[in-house]
Amino acid sequence: MKLQLCAVGRLRSGPERDLVEDYLARFERTGRPLGLPPVQLLELEDRKGGGMEAEADLIAKAVAPGAALVILDERGRTLSSPEFADHLAHWRDSGRDVALAIGGADGLAPRLRDRADLAMSLGRMVWPHMLVRVMLAEQLYRAATILAGSPYHRV
């Protein structure tokens, strides 16, 4: 299993990058004994300014062949943290590669949304795509702690 986080744009040095790196390091430490691979963070830049369609091309090229494509989209399904952990465990157990995709400021092209195996929402509010990385990295770590039976996730 390979786990990719494909995100449009680059995080500059600062608190958001620090948080993403911290949560992904925590995920790696917690997930390794559970058979979860480290997250491969792919920051994709549309240098030609082609908008959502060009960003969709970059994401499609970055996704491992045959990987389950999970997109973050405001129209997607809202999962609880334990439900997300169940999905992560299922992907791990099936051995299927997974690519989590975060679009740019304008979202994801419809053709990429149509291709997705799962469209996930972090709630009904719209979030800046840079903050979505932090939130998703934290949820990956939280999912690993749920699978490990750690007290990090309290209900």
Swiss-Prot record:
This enzyme's EC code(s): 2.1.1.177
Subcellular location: Cytoplasm
UniProt-annotated binding residues for S-adenosyl-L-methionine: L72, G103, L122, G123, R124, M125, V126, W127
CDD domains given in the database record: RlmH-like
Domain of life: Bacteria
Listed GO CC annotations: cytoplasm
Enzyme class per UniProt: transferase
Keywords from the named record: Cytoplasm, Methyltransferase, rRNA processing, S-adenosyl-L-methionine, Transferase
Main location: cytoplasm
Pfam families for this protein: SPOUT_MTase
Stored InterPro entries: Alpha/beta_knot_MTases (IPR029028), RlmH-like (IPR003742), tRNA_m1G_MTases_N (IPR029026)
Annotated catalysed reactions: pseudouridine(1915) in 23S rRNA + S-adenosyl-L-methionine = N(3)-methylpseudouridine(1915) in 23S rRNA + S-adenosyl-L-homocysteine + H(+)
GO terms of molecular function: rRNA (pseudouridine-N3-)-methyltransferase activity
Record's subunit section: Homodimer.
Protein role: Specifically methylates the pseudouridine at position 1915 (m3Psi1915) in 23S rRNA.
Matches recorded under HAMAP family: 23SrRNA_methyltr_H
Protein family: Belongs to the RNA methyltransferase RlmH family.
Official protein name in the record: Ribosomal RNA large subunit methyltransferase H
Designated gene of the protein: rlmH
